[in-house]
Amino acid sequence: RDFCLSRGLGDVYKRQDMGLVYLDTGAMYRIVTLKALNEGILGNDGLNELDKIKKLLDDLNIDIRENGFYLDDADVSEEIRKPIVSENVSDVAAIREVREKMVDLQRKFSESKNVILDGRDIGTVVFPNADLKIFLVADARERAKRRYRELIEKGENVEIEEIYENILKRDKIDSTRKESPLKKAKDAVEVDTTSKSIEEVKNEILRMINSNI
């Protein structure tokens, strides 16, 4: 169950009824990033106090509910998608202690459930023995357009070039980091969504899931 890249899989999941529980693992790293921003642990130059990040993890209160993500009992589902979080999440996600904590939570969440996990290291680190691994890819420009439309619909004031540059930066950081780098699992099926509609991608994924049930 290895899924990757900006937007697409969440939309695919919302348009199906397979009886599977969906978890966007990237949102969990965004929650840690949001909390670090709120507590002033992240500055203009990025991460600056590793010890405080570790303390933050000890006190972290994440609640994954059917209607969204909660931090300290507050719904942060929209807030974690803001550009300031996107700009900093890859730096936070590269920290070993953060990844270890999130992977542990992801595995606990998946106990006794049939799940779809959406993330950048699911098939290589979190669940290397998953029943099905799908590696979604798309051209960076297309991903920037998708994210731009999504943020504009939410009333955000954003520039598409900034989104594009942020995507390139995140991809570089995520694919070269020491801890759980972004890469395709050897047994993953790659699906290029660049020129495909959500409906087309959904149907393709459904066919693969049904053939593995």
Predicted features by range, described:
Residues 1-13:
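Single conserved hydrophobic/aromatic residue that forms the stacking wall/gate
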Residues 9, 128-132, 186-188:
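Short glycine-/polar-rich loops that comprise or flank the Walker A/P-loop
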Residues 26, 73, 102, 116, ...:
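Residue-level signal for inorganic ion chemistry
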Residues 77-154:
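ATP-dependent NMP and nucleoside kinases share a basic, alpha-helical "lid"
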